[in-house]
UniProtKB/Swiss-Prot annotation:
It comes from the Bacteria. InterPro entries: FAS1-like_DH_region, HadA-like, HotDog_dom_sf. Belongs to the UPF0336 family. Pfam families: FAS1_DH_region. This is UPF0336 protein TWT_721.
Length: 140
């Protein structure tokens, strides 16, 4: 398997940001209203801090179809960390880059550590770095 995989960029829309904010039941108006966000000094509607998780589905689909030989029914989510360089805003065009940081066996299981970096399509700057730890259980 390639250790670094680039995915197509995705445009972040106000609609998706507001939909996600409603789904996680946040009350902060900067996640629901462009006017509230701009009056708070932001350039536009702000993404809820966990919004980066919307890219995880695409990453998991790739991992399952890769040569890592993973059965989706055996994956357990270990942990996930978000390191923001700046907030995600409506209008951003973000390109995810996946790196497999670790793939090690222990007992009848594996630990796979993924790093997903969201790059700004315009500046190529890091916006968010997510570290995702998956545990792949062995067959019973």
């Amino acid at each position: 398997m390639t250790q670094k995989v680039e995915f197509p960029p995705r445009h972040v829309t106000e609609e998706k940001l507001m939909e996600f904010a409603r789904a996680v039941h946040t009350q902060n108006k900067i996640y629901h209203s462009t006017a509230a966000a701009t009056s708070s000094g932001y350039p536009g509607l702000v993404a809820v801090p966990t919004f980066g998780a919307v890219w995880v589905g695409q990453i998991l689909e790739y991992i399952i179809s890769s040569d890592l030989n993973i059965d989706y029914s055996h994956i357990v989510h270990g942990e996930q960390h978000f390191l923001y360089k700046r907030p995600i805003f409506a209008g951003d065009i973000l390109r995810p880059i996946l790196r497999i940081k670790r793939d090690r066996a222990f007992g009848n299981a594996r630990q796979i550590v993924l790093e997903v970096t969201l790059l700004s399509e315009g500046s190529n700057d890091d916006v968010l770095v997510m570290t995702i730890t998956l545990i792949v259980r062995g067959k019973a």
